[in-house]
Amino acid sequence: MTECVIRGERASSCTRPADVGACSPEYAIRYEDVSFSYKPGTLFMEGLSAAIPAGAVTSIVGPNGCGKSTLVKLAAGLLRPTAGRVEVAGHDTASLASRERAHLMAVLAQSSRVPPMTVAALVACGRHPHLGWGGRLGPDDRAAVEAAMERAGVACFRSHDLHQLSGGERQRAHVARTLAQDTDLIVLDEPTTYLDISACHDLMALVRDLNRREGKTVAMVIHDLDLALRYSDYLVVMQKGRVTAQGPTDEVLASGAVGDAFHMDICPHDRLSSMRDEAVAGARAETDRGYVLYPRRR
């Protein structure tokens, strides 16, 4: 099979719950006293406040089921809060039409559905918010689609039907769609799903490239803590429908919030040798950004 490569170069205060909403006014997404319920009478989120800063790469991390994807869906307008306010670029999402929202943010959401279309047709969907009456792609739109496919590493699959691709290749095609949309804010819900290790790092390098070179704001829901720590400027930590901390990555790590959420201890990389000597049998140490993470003893 033809190999495609994602184009990219591999390449700050922490707040606790009481003041988690008191962030810089320069934010891309803001949640103000948000409550949400999946079932009547049972609140999944209650009084949640958080902010995603503009101009940064932010990872939303936490255990399975803590509310990370719910947070993204509230911003994307796929869910509506039971109470409170969600803003994107200063606009209340409750008052935004879908086309208006699509001009503000591009969203890669989790989905098991495989649309019956080619890669090029899927990526072209990212241009729909920019099309005028008649909905036909112009020369600039076609150029944007080609550029997005090249950057996401799927140009060689442009004429392939999506069902012919592997899960990882389809995921990269959806990433290309978000790139073609060309918004200042990109929101990615588990973008590394189905990707192998090398492709994960290539994708994260592309994310950093979009931020550093083009000034894009990127917010990611991500389970892989190693990738979150390596590539994020800012972390939002969640547990059981609550934001427990947010801020620059190193400061959130120093606060202990990440370790508490994942039941792991985190120490500086230069303590690796001594920690290995003390590690319990079966524990596996992982290094990243100058830190060592290992499971806490039960």
Label every model-predicted segment.
Residues 84-92, 101:
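Conserved ABC transporter NBD signature motif
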Residues 186-190:
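Catalytic Walker B motif of ABC-type/P-loop ATPase nucleotide-binding domains
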Residues 61-63:
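The feature captures the beta-strand-to-loop junction immediately N-terminal to the Walker
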Residues 135-136, 161-165, 169:
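Conserved ABC ATPase signature
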